[in-house]
């Protein structure tokens, strides 16, 4: 055991030396955007609860009622006894939202991608992935055993070059991207990617974790491109929908295959009833008031105007500072001023691009957004 502890200690020391060690910070959420850490209350700009629906009384009530009616957990894999009725209801609603034949719900977004990708491709196939795609896409690709190729971020020309080079020797080809990129907030050119996939007989997977609920009246980034054909539409329930879980929307045949072969569904306990009920309640609220989905982007654009940044196209706005040390220092100073803006460091983002990742929600007050923008402007002036 001493060798194991020594190994762990050496790894931690190396991370400390680069300001890359991460630590958990217990955080209590209060009403609106207020959080509490170590007895100090702050306005959080680091939460992905874009519509503040996790705090909505109807969403909370739905979760509580489901726990009382069905139990606290699913108690088994969905293929055993864990497929409670709420999951079928949720899958129908998600498929309707995304305009597909069917949907498959997983325990999380990470489990969705690490289950879907190895089910669809394997040795003899090729996966082409956007350079800045989420870690769970890369993890799923590595598990698949397929050849993995990276294309330049949001660059259809580079993707086409690689398709021309790789597609002929591969049995199947999968192109995978985020719809809204989680660390930069930009949107994939899904129309151009779709056209290339159709031309080269490749399958397009879009991870819309940060688009569903906040773009195109809640339908997500794919709906911004009416001509795009996206056969594999993945997303989460844990961000704008304020619950927990992940899903893949697609054809009935694809979903049927996932439900019998995706290892992260077959060998994992089903999503708890409370999580499914909360997501259903959130979908009800969005359907009843689709204009609510416009608020997070409007808040983000208030911030970018105030700070003189390019106009936001999603609720995520990065302020890139460069080194991990500078990002940590800026985050600490903002906490001193009453704002929780977590520093994002490598390997989550590329070396030299450590940043403040600012996430806007319907819970944010305009006055707080302006105060944050002004505080960051002063930090940038001091740094320069």
From Swiss-Prot:
Record keyword Membrane present: no
Cofactors (names): pyridoxal 5'-phosphate
EC number, UniProt record: 2.3.1.47
Catalysed reaction, written as an equation: 6-carboxyhexanoyl-[ACP] + L-alanine + H(+) = (8S)-8-amino-7-oxononanoate + holo-[ACP] + CO2
Alphabetized SUPFAM superfamilies for the sequence: PLP-dependent transferases
Sequence positions that bind pyridoxal 5'-phosphate: 109-110, 182, 207-210, 236-239
EC class (word): transferase
GO molecular function, one term: 8-amino-7-oxononanoate synthase activity
Keyword terms of this UniProt record: Biotin biosynthesis, Pyridoxal phosphate, Transferase
N6-(pyridoxal phosphate)lysine carried by residues: 239
Pathway in which this enzyme or protein is active: Cofactor biosynthesis; biotin biosynthesis
Subunit field text: Homodimer.
Cited function: Catalyzes the decarboxylative condensation of pimeloyl-[acyl-carrier protein] and L-alanine to produce 8-amino-7-oxononanoate (AON), [acyl-carrier protein], and carbon dioxide.
NCBIfam families: bioF
Protein name: Putative 8-amino-7-oxononanoate synthase
Organism per entry: Caulobacter vibrioides (strain NA1000 / CB15N)
